[in-house]
Amino acid sequence: MHSDKLKSHFDNKVVWLTGASSGIGRALAIALSKYDCQLYLSSRTHDQLVKTRDMCDQPENVHIEAGDLSVLETNKTICKKIEAQSGQLDIAILNAGTCEYVDVNNFDSALFERLITHNYLSMVYGIEASLPLLKESADAQLVGMSSTAGYLGIPRSEAYGSTKAAIINMLRALKVSLKPNNIDVSVICPGFVKTELTDRNDFPMPAMISAELAAEHIVKGIVKRTHEI
């Protein structure tokens, strides 16, 4: 894709990116910082967000808003700060989440609760907090991170895959529901990406790509307004 098209898409936009302290989120922050947008980064770990900002091309355009995104009020507070500082929000990229694997010999409902909270509900809260601002934007996009695991019943991924399937379903529905509000909705469904999370895996991961390459594909998908990236 021509660099001018990428540039024109993000220039003068206000972007909120969650889960920006590591992995795909960090790579996305670095990729987006090349453009003249105001970039707000969120995650639970302030120090790691500072590291992400230090790696960005235009750190003066990168703002840190740390907090626990599994709490609704945290999301609302961050969006209020974005509105107060920048007056608008054009693109919300809700990427925060984690991964744990199920042991069927020690089936633990608490693990499911954790992943539902951190993967699914954190996105629901981010949507609730950001929608009022996105509805005011003339060119809004809502983007959520899922996974190919959301399409497949992978052993040990019963909890993780379920949350990702829920995200796919929700964003497919919102694509239709938010059309009258002129909000484009995309869902990101990567395969294996080399990150701190996948470094912990103890099984083969075919066709793995780097976080940087994943971020490149995601940015292009956002510009094309592709629903499933």
What function would you assign to each model-found segment?
Residues 66-77, 109:
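The beta1-alpha1 cofactor-binding region of Rossmann-like NAD(H)/NADP(H)-dependent oxidoreductases
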Residues 21-22:
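Conserved glycine-rich cofactor-binding loop
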Residues 127, 163:
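Active-site helix of classical SDR
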Residues 35-52:
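Conserved glycine-rich Rossmann-like NAD(P)H-binding loop of the short-chain dehydrogenase/reductase
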Residues 187, 203-229:
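C-terminal helical subdomain
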Residues 103-116:
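Substrate-binding pocket helix/loop in short-chain dehydrogenase/reductase
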Residues 147:
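Residue(s) in the substrate-gating loop at a strand-loop-helix junction
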